């Protein structure tokens, strides 16, 4: 009987399939970061002396009256990244259980079932009992004396405090829950609503994260190592383009305000686009022969050797890859977080740690994030061609890891001397964020190409292996996020409000750079890389790269003086 999985699929069809799946991953990245950018602000609490009516926009105003604090805010990320880890680890099991086609459909479907968070986070004209916004009653209006002339009965308002008594705008008495830093952050109902909001929002991450893993079967079945290297490097563009698409519009204050006001409509459109991409995958994948891995059945298990997750986990090389991948994930994601921007602000001199605003554009995390991710454009041209060479990869990995440490130290130095709030300081930090991004993202692409070159793994094992790398990598990132948030919040928790978090910032910086140094040590114990033809070993890569050898940047398939460097 013919084994259907062994039929050759054309590279054109594989590349088209890869485009559809990586587009699904890009949609996840866009959705994920847009939700953060349109979060808005907490409602605050209106009192009889309030003179300015707040603008309620974004989903934060549905659940919180005040900021919940560093640890509480980060705990949301911990929960979500852990769920992403679980999804990534299970994606290998899912693909073996249901086959490649249905595994991708399941994960795209999970992304679509996030839609209840739209209902949970929308006040529904004041009828959503899980939010803080309520229609203003006449009795409450009369007591808000400083605002009464600007108010209308029935308009949505957040909680109010009158004569020491807290109530919703419709007059319902409530008790506010206090956060770790002593702020009153919301009601029991609104915190419950927030928990449900996060649960359904997490399905975007669980499904979307796995899609980048599911690009690997298409890449693994390509006809040449050169094409595999190109698409493996291009995989990172799904994340980087998504970040750039999200952050660029939000550089402008008016876009931020409008998007926060209409966040429900924006997210609805995005979910519909994900569903359309699911339908496109369903149609296109049905036109081609199934690729590895297939659903496990008695028939195909008797014809081929199916990979086993436990065997992959028993391999020591797997854990070395997981260790380095987890640290690289921390390296590429941490500079995109508010915690990193807070670190740069804290080390900046007093008076030079604020934001620069022109009235239209405001400096901040969004600008640095864009420079960080588009740095991969430089890395893609200058550094990524190394992945197509016959050089041993260890020295190259050491070079990139060391370069990242140096660039991050330079960024911190400029923040500490010139300040992130000065034009010169912010400009230099932006430039070196671009350079650092080039090193960091190129490091990530080099790390992702290694499993294709290690003799320990066959191509039908790669989806499971990458699932473990992503899954345990997110666990590592979660542990880092927890540790860093504790470091940053510890001075305030120990000594109270108003305490400088500088000691925690210094510890966080040392911890961050120390992890990168640890990855440098782990790389030393990586096995040798091989040129492979499918699963067949052709030749070990023994040629050692030297720091002054950069001919690979211009080497190509044509017969030129550097063509021998290529696989």
Swiss-Prot record:
Superkingdom of source: Bacteria
Residue ranges crossing the lipid bilayer per the database entry: 15-35, 78-98, 104-124, 193-213, 230-250, 264-284, 321-341, 363-383, 405-425, 426-446, 462-482, 503-523
Major location (coarse): membrane
Cellular component terms per the entry's GO annotation: plasma membrane
Membrane topology label: Multi-pass membrane protein
Keywords: Cell membrane, Membrane, Transmembrane, Transmembrane helix, Transport
Gene3D superfamilies: MFS general substrate transporter like domains
Disruption phenotype: Not essential, it can be deleted.
Family to which this protein belongs: Belongs to the major facilitator superfamily.
Official protein name in the record: Major facilitator superfamily transporter MG061
Taxonomic lineage of the native organism: Bacteria, Bacillati, Mycoplasmatota, Mycoplasmoidales, Mycoplasmoidaceae
